[in-house]
Amino acid sequence: MATLVLATRQESAAARLKDAATVAVVALLLGIPMIGLTTVDQGGALRVATRWPALAAFVAACFCGRLLLRYVIDRLRQRRRTREHADTATPNENTAANPWLNRLGWGALAFALLLPVAFSDNRYVVDTATTVLIYVMLGWGLNVVVGLAGLLDLGYVAFYAVGAYTYALLSTQFGWGFWQALPVAGGVTASFGILLGWPTLRLRGDYLAIVTLGFGEIIRIVLVNWTEMSGGPNGITSIPRPSFFGLPFKPPGDAPTFAAAFGLEFSPSHRVIFLYYLILLLALLTNLFVSRMRQLPIGRAWEAMREDEIACKAMGINARNVKLSAFAIGAMLGGFAGVFFAARQGFISPESFTFNESAIILAIVVLGGMGSQLGVVLASLVLVLLPELGRDFAEYRMLLFGAAMILIMIWKPGGILAHREPTLRYLSGSAAR
């Protein structure tokens, strides 16, 4: 037995070394043009210079990093297998044995509430946190369509754009306020969700993804070319900002203002903090709404449809209504986020709603874990903060961003907090008992 264990460990170590060597070779080939060779200006002429020590350090770091990563992954897999063999608990006991998720959620909420107070003098931090919350809200909206209903949507940014332009037009053309336009914009985007969902009822997988991708591009092209309505490529400017119960965030004047009403000295940070708490309120309401929907029959129908559509139809579930409701609710939540985006920016254009935005939102849902609310929050933090932290490394910013995404998918293939647990393991455990 000892000889067998020793041989297994030797094979595992050899496999790890081979894998790390492969990564080092790939890093060497990619690093020669990116790191090993560079151009320097010498007397007005460009000359090729070499940086072999930096390249060697990069290759060594990749080799050691991959070796360490494989070791950690193997240890985690071994520990998981040991735990599964020793686990005799029922599914309900396993679910209740994760109280740290609840503590993590409450901790994140407390941190979000106190963040503007802790960074009241740092507008950049509050602005970045506001951007994170926008993507959290978008991720929760797309999570209804992709994570719960299992419908791959590559054009989700279209609903984001419809909500933003609806508020922009209602506020600039008709003088509507933020809270007046918010439910109307949600209804408009929900109707667009039904409009998209109706012709795609019989489509699945890749075909559905292609249709939704085309829908997103159609919306963007319409916004670019319909200049009378959308302003074309120039967009819509002078969009009113939301106020605090009618009190604008302006310097004191003849009209009552927020600072004057509360006896404060005027500061531009007041509006930034107010917008942060506003999107935090919208995000919390979105979370409560989606969590409640998941407990209702419609939410259970979404998840059942995701697992096996044919079985759902055999049980009498109306697949058409289930799909349309997922598209409509997901679109409505994206429209709410679009309304806030337009109100925050004061200016929107079609360039704000490209396919890249859809890809980022989908990546947030996938990396966070399909169907996981808290996972969407963590993935939004990673995907929004990484590019911000990499601004000082402009040359390697996207390289670091892509490497982080790859590492997350290697470490957690089901997402940071995978919601879908394999049921067969519990069934086999019950059968064994």
Describe the residue ranges of each PLM region.
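Hydrophobic alpha-helical segments that mediate membrane insertion or helix-helix packing
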Residues: T200, A311-C312
